[in-house]
Amino acid sequence: MARQYFTDGPYIDPPVSNLTTLTATTIEDMWAGITWTPIFANDAKAGKMYCVRAGGTISLTGGTAIITPQWGPAGTTLGASLTVGTVTATIAAWYLSFDLVFRTIGAAGANSTCVGAGFMAFNGGVVSGSANPNIIAFGGTSATVDTTINGNITIRKTLSGVNSVIPQWVSIFSRN
């Protein structure tokens, strides 16, 4: 039977196995945006909203976290999070949500504008008798981008402590 979504494409099926385990203490892509969260050339329209959802597991030894959303092959930053303190956690679940809205669409070149916001949430570990979960908000920076070429939404993470982040799934859809 054909797909009968109440949402709009791009229609990219989520991965059927875990993506690469991430362990760097420097900035790194959480997944390959060109593969898992693409936005095809000329698909964006003024007012169109793209939604990215992802989840997996995370292990941390405390430290800090920064989450940075980016657009397209040039890596245009859409507003990094504040530097947030993290707790120690072992194999905690995480969930990420990011919505990107195109405000204007222009001619070829960086003549279209978009803005987005989202969050990454994961359970807290027990540190000195506390069990604080982390919710890291990011985005909010309006950006000028080129929508006449293939683009993508890439979410990047920077964790300062020893860490293991396993993206288990990621999806993209548009609401309109």
PLM features: what roles do these ranges have?
Residues A2-N176:
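Surface-exposed molecular-recognition determinants
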